[in-house]
Amino acid sequence: MISRDFKISNKLGLHARPSAQITQVASRYFAEVWISKSERRVNAKSIMGVMMLAAGQGSVLTVEADGPDEAQAVDAIGELIASGFGELD
């Protein structure tokens, strides 16, 4: 299992479009992928779960993965979060 923390930098946080982007990326991998904020942990392949995190700008998310391509899954989601989901000014 691999785990890394990422900070949400876009102004609107995890609204519908970024949540959909995360689930699309997570679904490309065989690994089980979870995202946590505080005490809430959700399946990263579930758009409803990701949206329920209600992660605003400045929130820190922990991305965890377990499986044959776990490192690639965490890296890909981390790159997406770092890019601000294409919403950075």
Language model features with spans:
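Intrinsic-disorder/low-complexity, polar/charged segments enriched in Ser/Thr/Lys/Arg/Asp/Glu/Gln
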Residues: 1-5, 60-62
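Compact, glycine-rich, soluble single-domain proteins
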Residues: 7-57
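C-terminal structural segments of small proteins and small subunits
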Residues: 56-89
